[in-house]
């Protein structure tokens, strides 16, 4: 039993252990671009064009892990970009932790896209840390070529979520999860004196390795229109 708990603890901590290297941030950007492309390419399951038009920021967590032998906890590291007057900003790096998905056996990876759709949600993302469900509300976003004629999705939550497990779309309750700046990764890419707010406000030039992710963000609307 002790050995099983040790394995569980190592698995839960694994995603946090390799943050901060340039190789990790490059891989994360490439994986995030792939997640965006694949979610948008899913017939009648992609993010609607209207939602993308309305988006203030888009955040992607490739392969968020839930695991543990008692209570499942979320662990993931992602990238985010916000809309500025000059286009989409350079990517900021963040971590998502906490919350619970109930009793779990083993570990499962989930791809997550969060569309921040109003000024309040954007301001929370610009801060160094906030809690979903407390500082900002989240709800499952509409899917398909066009958003529902019902406009509740524009008003009900600051964040619309889209999640995928093993290629299938799945609902995900992020209540209680905390999103914070990934300091190690930010320093690895931008140096020690650049924070998340400066990056997402468009004050920092995007590094070359961000090109695939930013291209996926810019191209998402075209993919939605072509569904």
Description of each model-found segment:
Residues 4-14:
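Sec-dependent N-terminal signal peptides
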Residues 15-19:
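Sec/Tat signal peptide C-region and signal peptidase I cleavage site
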């Amino acid at each position: 039993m002790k050995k099983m708990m040790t394995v569980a603890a190592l698995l839960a901590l694994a995603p946090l252990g390799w943050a901060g290297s340039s190789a990790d941030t490059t891989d994360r950007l490439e994986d995030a671009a792939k997640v965006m492309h694949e979610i948008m390419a899913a017939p009648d399951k992609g993010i609607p064009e209207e939602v993308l038009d309305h988006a203030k920021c888009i955040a992607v967590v490739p392969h968020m892990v839930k695991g543990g032998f008692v209570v499942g906890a979320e662990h993931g590291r992602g990238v985010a970009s916000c809309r500025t007057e000059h286009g989409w900003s350079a990517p900021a790096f963040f971590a998502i932790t906490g919350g619970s998905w109930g009793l779990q056996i083993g570990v499962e990876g989930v791809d997550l896209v969060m569309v921040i759709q109003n000024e309040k949600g954007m301001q929370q993302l610009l801060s160094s840390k906030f809690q979903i469900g407390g500082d900002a509300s989240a709800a499952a976003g509409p899917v398909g070529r066009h958003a529902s004629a019902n406009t509740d999705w524009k008003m009900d939550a600051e964040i619309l979520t889209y999640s995928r497990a093993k290629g299938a779309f799945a609902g995900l309750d992020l209540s209680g999860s905390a999103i914070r700046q990934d300091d190690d990764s930010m320093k690895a890419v931008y140096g020690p004196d650049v924070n998340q707010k400066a990056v997402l406000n468009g004050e920092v030039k995007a590094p070359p390795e961000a090109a695939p992710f930013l291209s996926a963000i810019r191209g998402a609307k075209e993919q939605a229109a072509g569904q």
